[in-house]
Each structure stands twice: as structure tokens, then as C-alpha cells.
């Protein structure tokens, strides 16, 4: 897959004479709803003998449009989004730098300067996709703005267990620790990536050595607590239990940490890139009166983790 970065206003150098089918969306999470849009675009592209493209933005529009300075947390930072698009068979991913100037485009100007200029023959997007200044352009109006220059397919609302499949619902589920719900809407286990760093090394003194992970700051982090996870490092996947918290049993002013006790694992992996797939929330972070209580709880957490994955893989 080719990734092309566009800056408004795009120049003729950035245009392309390759006709294509284009899926529109921000696509954070590349969840089942997004996948339905992209699969529809791919199907049409296959029928027409065209390439499949997506048009997305960076950063999230709310970063630019908000009156207060804010940092948006993503389900899939741009690199992850590109990786998932490639796996879905997308040929080209256009990434438009979202700026104040770009946000001022009228719906007609967006259509003319981006969709038509990029030689789009057919546009596919979800029913609630909007475009142009303040999102004034709706999918029901797109054929009017196209004026016969391209075709339009609108993908209906996608649901799972009666929930609308949306990035908003997935973010809510993750921040509430509802990983099973989030993963059902995503169509895959929620995943964060980071680097293994040195920690306080307390875990090894109580029989539970952990890998401390410095997670990319762009990721949305689940709520505090202990989780069943799968941990991937050096091309191998292992079962584990992850703790997100402040180590309050030992000290009250600790920084937030993400630590993973990797089951049946005994290697040094400092400095390695790692991936955490989040499966199940077990319990909130607890403060224990002594180390003995903590060890007893960790032993139970390990039993729960093994039981969870044994049941999952039955």
C-alpha cells in the first residue's frame, strides 16, 4: 500500500491520473463499521478494475477545531491505521493534514479540490459521514455536489449486539474497562504498542517479575486495573496479566505505569518493541496493607488469567 500525505491546498503535483474508488472516513480503530465501508469500496473497485483508496485526516479534527488545547487519544494512531488498511487490501491511503484552512472548505470545494482532483470514479462512505465546513456536507447531498462526475454508495449503520459500531462507543467501552464489548465492535482485540523499559523491579522480589511498557502517548489507555492480555515481543505471543496503575501499595505519588507479568516467560527484553492485546478486565487497582496480601491477590489474578484463556481457546 502506498501512503500519500496531502497538504491544503493540494497542488497539481499531488494529483493523480489513476482512476479509483475511494472510501471516506477518519477510520479511528478501523472497526467493523469501517471495514464494511472499505470492503464495499474494494468490491466496487474489483468490478470496475480500479484501485481502492481511502481518504483520512491527521490529526483528529477536534484537535484543530476545539477552543481549548487538547490531546486526542486514538484507538489506532496513524501508523497502526495504515497497517490495518494495508491488510484490508487498500492500494492508496491519502492522509490530509487537517488544518484550520482545510476546515473552512465548503462541501462543494472539498468535492472539487479533493475527490474530483484525485480522479475518484466512485465514493463509498458511511451514512453519517460529513464533510466541508462544520460538517455541513452530508452523504445524502454528495451526488448533488458530484454533479455526475463520480458515483456514490452510502453504507448503512452497522450494529453489533444492538450497539451502533462507532469509534465513540468503542472509546467509551475501553475507558470503562468493557474490553469484551470494545473488541466485539472492533472485530479484533484492542491493541497498544510500546517499548519495554526499566522499572522499580519490585515484581521480581515477590515472584512476579513484570515488563514495564512505555506506551506510545497517542493511544487511548484502558481504565486503571488488572487485565488478561496477550503480549507479543520478538515475533512471539505470550499470555499475560497487565496492571495499569500507580503502585499505590508501595507509594502514593508514583507515576502511572503499565506493567505486564508474562506467564511462563523468563527472558530479558529491555528495549524491545512490544504489543499488548487487551482481552478482559478483572479488577480495579487495590491498595494492600502488606506484601503478603498483594502476593495472594496476584496469585489469584494469575489463576484467573489462565482460566480465562483456557476457556477462550476451548
From Swiss-Prot:
* A Pfam family reported for this protein in Swiss-Prot or TrEMBL: FAD_syn
Note the CDD domains from the entry.
FAD_synthetase_N
Q: List the disulfide bonds.
A: none
For this entry, list what GO says about its biological process.
Answer: FAD biosynthetic process; FMN biosynthetic process; riboflavin biosynthetic process; riboflavin metabolic process
Which pathway does the database say it acts in? Cofactor biosynthesis; FAD biosynthesis; FAD from FMN: step 1/1; Cofactor biosynthesis; FMN biosynthesis; FMN from riboflavin (ATP route): step 1/1
InterPro entries named among the record's database cross-references: Cyt_trans-like (IPR004821), FAD_synthase (IPR015864), Riboflavin_kinase (IPR023468), Riboflavin_kinase_bac (IPR002606), Riboflavin_kinase_bac/euk (IPR015865), Riboflavin_kinase_dom_sf (IPR023465), Rossmann-like_a/b/a_fold (IPR014729)
Q: List the transmembrane segments.
A: none
Q: What is its EC number?
A: 2.7.1.26, 2.7.7.2
Q: Tell me the enzyme class.
A: transferase
Family named by the database record = Belongs to the RibF family.
Q: What is this protein called?
A: Bifunctional riboflavin kinase/FMN adenylyltransferase
Tell me which species this is from: Listeria monocytogenes serovar 1/2a (strain ATCC BAA-679 / EGD-e)
Amino acid at each position: 500500500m502506498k501512503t500519500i500525505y496531502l497538504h491544503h491546498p493540494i497542488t497539481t503535483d499531488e494529483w493523480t491520473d489513476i482512476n479509483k474508488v475511494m472510501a471516506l472516513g477518519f477510520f479511528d480503530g478501523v472497526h467493523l463499521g469501517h471495514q464494511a465501508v472499505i470492503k464495499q469500496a474494494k468490491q466496487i473497485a474489483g468490478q470496475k478494475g480500479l484501485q481502492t483508496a481511502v481518504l483520512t485526516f491527521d490529526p483528529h479534527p477536534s484537535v484543530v477545531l476545539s477552543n481549548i488545547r487538547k490531546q486526542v487519544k486514538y484507538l489506532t494512531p496513524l501508523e497502526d491505521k495504515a497497517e490495518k488498511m494495508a491488510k484490508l487490501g487498500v492500494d492508496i491511503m491519502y492522509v490530509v493534514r487537517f488544518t484550520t484552512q482545510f476546515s473552512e472548505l465548503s462541501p462543494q470545494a472539498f468535492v472539487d479540490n479533493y475527490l474530483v482532483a484525485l480522479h475518484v470514479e466512485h465514493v463509498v462512505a458511511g451514512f453519517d459521514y460529513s464533510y466541508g465546513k462544520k460538517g455541513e456536507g452530508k452523504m445524502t447531498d454528495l451526488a448533488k455536489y458530484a454533479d455526475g462526475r463520480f458515483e456514490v454508495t452510502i453504507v448503512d449503520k452497522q450494529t453489533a449486539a444492538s450497539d451502533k459500531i462507532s469509534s465513540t462507543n468503542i472509546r467509551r467501552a475501553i475507558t470503562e474497562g468493557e474490553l469484551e464489548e470494545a473488541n466485539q465492535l472492533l472485530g479484533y482485540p484492542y491493541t497498544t504498542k510500546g517499548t519495554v523499559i526499566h522499572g522499580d523491579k519490585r515484581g521480581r522480589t515477590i515472584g512476579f517479575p513484570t515488563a514495564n511498557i512505555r506506551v506510545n502517548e497517542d493511544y487511548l489507555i484502558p481504565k486503571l486495573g488488572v487485565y488478561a492480555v496477550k503480549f507479543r515481543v520478538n515475533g512471539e505471543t505470550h499470555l499475560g496479566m497487565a496492571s495499569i496503575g500507580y503502585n499505590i501499595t508501595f507509594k502514593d505519588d508514583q507515576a502511572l505505569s503499565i506493567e505486564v507479568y508474562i506467564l511462563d516467560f523468563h527472558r530479558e527484553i529491555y528495549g524491545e518493541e512490544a504489543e499488548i492485546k487487551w482481552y478482559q478486565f478483572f479488577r480495579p487497582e487495590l491498595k494492600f496493607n502488606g506484601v503478603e496480601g498483594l502476593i495472594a491477590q496476584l496469585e489469584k489474578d494469575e489463576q484467573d488469567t489462565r482460566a480465562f484463556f483456557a476457556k477462550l481457546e476451548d
